[in-house]
Amino acid sequence: MWKRWRIRILLFLAVLGPGFITANVDNDSGGILTYSQAGAQYGYTLLWTMIPITIALIVVQEMCARMGVVTGKGLSDLIREEFGLRLTFVLMVLLVVVNYTNVVTEFIGIAGSLHLFHVTKFISVPFCAALVWFMVVRGNYKSTEKIFLVASVVYIAYIFAGVLSQPSWHDALLATVKLPQGSVWRDKMYMYTAIGVVGTTIAPWMQFYLQSSIVEKGIRVKDYGASRLDVIVGSFFTDVVAWFIVVACAATLFVHGMGAIQFASDAAEAMRPLAGDYAFILFAFGLFNASLFAASILPLSTAYTVCEGMGFESGVDKNFKEAPFFYWLYTLLIVGGAATVLALPDSQLINFAILSQVLNGVLLPVVIILMLLLINRKDLMGKHKNSPLWNVIAWGTSLIVIGMTMVMLWGMMPGH
């Protein structure tokens, strides 16, 4: 019995990485800002989103992992082959634009978190940009993945910060399983924030990166059970962390009437007199780790996706000469994101942070629908195509996000 379990554990550890990393990098600077804003402005009333979002995240991520294992191809590669180059090109342009705003947001997070420790952005941003570039360009897949796995574990700091904030556990748990009542449903910004929460939790770029990572790792169909567990564990852990971020800000900033915040670093600073130095340090350190982690992954994900979609060579195990477009795009996104943060005043950068998460939410249904069309093709997936239950959850997620987006846009029109 023990021998059988030991083999299963070793197999899980062997494939651990893509699902766990992808889900956890989801809690990036923009995500932390969105969750912090949700807690600071609306208390516990957005916690109800966590359970359905976790289920949807597991379903969507699992579909990507399964397609990667069965087909041996990345998502953008499959989209190009099945839907043509024109659609792929348009989708890649949209993804690069959205991901650029996401990369800017990560460097905002780096600047804000280190500013709390009196380090100017003119030192922190260039240094960290060079660090993440060197780590990926001069590393290889195995060493890079190990670094990312360690960074994923550091997110536990937010769980400790949530506990130190001394929330009302009864109210928080009740709000998680019960829909809010009253005027929040008529609040335009409540709907806007809810879409941001969905967009930051199930971001479009995650699906492309996960499938590419699965393919590059070379996971076989017979080992897929362990890979699926990797996705489930990663998705559950990332949303537990998100839950504690909302709770920490609700128990401190919302309770004391501080309301909206501009940057995620503001949440850490405001938390200091309310929850103590330890909560402040954990929140600030967690923000720095999340921002640095995502500043590495997001440009990497974009480079993978575009190269696959347009037929260029890609992969961190290839050198600059073998995959020039891959490395140039990765470099330009890092340099462009860092330069934007250095060039613009902080007051203008907040627009990038919030907009990036909403753009994620708007683009998400398009990506999920393309995934569903692919994964339900018997000639492509064989016996591994979607089950009816998986289709219901995935289509439901798309329709709900589309509906929320339409309501938000209608509410923002003059006279509404």
Model regions and ranges:
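Juxtamembrane transmembrane-helix boundary signature
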Residues: 22, 49-83, 91-101
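Hydrophobic alpha-helical segments and their helix-loop junctions in multi-pass secondary transporters
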Residues: 153-181, 191-212, 370-379, 404-416
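Transmembrane alpha-helical segments of multi-pass small-molecule transport proteins
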Residues: 92-93, 116-137, 158, 325-339, ...
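Flexible loop linkers connecting adjacent transmembrane helices
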Residues: 34-39, 62-87, 142, 256-272, ...
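Loop-to-transmembrane helix boundary motifs in multi-pass membrane proteins
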Residues: 85-86, 122-125, 233, 237, ...
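Extracellular/periplasmic helix-exit of transmembrane alpha-helices
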Residues: 58-70, 215, 236-266
